[in-house]
């Protein structure tokens, strides 16, 4: 039996070549280390200029972008990490660092609580500021304090209080001829005689009153009782 040594040599060479290529591909795949980290193909990293960071491994057969920690629908496709994937059980956070999934979820919960607390504090502060502003406006537009107003307007309001509230009228008869309420009450209390009538209404000139005195009793009946302001006018 004749064996062509040339063909055999070529077959051996091809077998050795494909075996070498296969071993190279196997070495390029990441392998999990003893401490949970991944060994990477430093030759490929050196060739591509990409260095994977902690909790990452090199992957030259990348098909899709990675998921982000705080948004699973937001894919990370940054150029500097296109061949470095997070190890199994890790996920990339908003700082582009691979962290454990439970740490990622815990971090997101803390962020949510912080945002909610901040929003509540902002709302409380705005409400407090609004109350202060409303209180300031109310005080600035009120000249009299509530307690003082209650004291001033409790019971009968006299002319002095009215002038204080509504303003004192100019050229008022009150300035020229102030009325003494107590004195008037004393003067007009009971029967009114002719002298009192003359004092109030004035004594008429050339009056028949000098010859024919008035009937005091009749006048007293007319003006007996309390004389109001209209009668005085």
UniProtKB/Swiss-Prot annotation:
InterPro entries cross-referenced by the UniProt entry: Ser_inhib-like_sf, TIL_dom
Keyword Signal: yes
Start and end residues of each stretch annotated as Disordered: 201-233
Signal peptide positions on this chain: 1-28
Source taxon at top rank: Viruses
Keyword field contains Signal: yes
Stretches assigned to the TIL domain: 52-104
One GO process term, biological-process aspect: symbiont-mediated suppression of host innate immune response
Keywords: Host-virus interaction, Inhibition of host innate immune response by virus, Signal, Viral immunoevasion
Annotated function: Counteracts the host humoral immune response by inhibiting the processing and the amidolytic activity of host PAP3. Thereby, melanization of host hemolymph, normally producing several reactive intermediates toxic for viruses, is deregulated and proper immune response cannot occur.
Subunit: Interacts with host PAP1 and PAP3.
Protein family: Belongs to the polydnaviridae EGF-like motif protein family.
UniProt-recorded name of the protein: Protease inhibitor Egf1.0
Organism for this UniProt entry: Microplitis demolitor bracovirus (isolate Webb)
Gene that this polypeptide is encoded by: O12
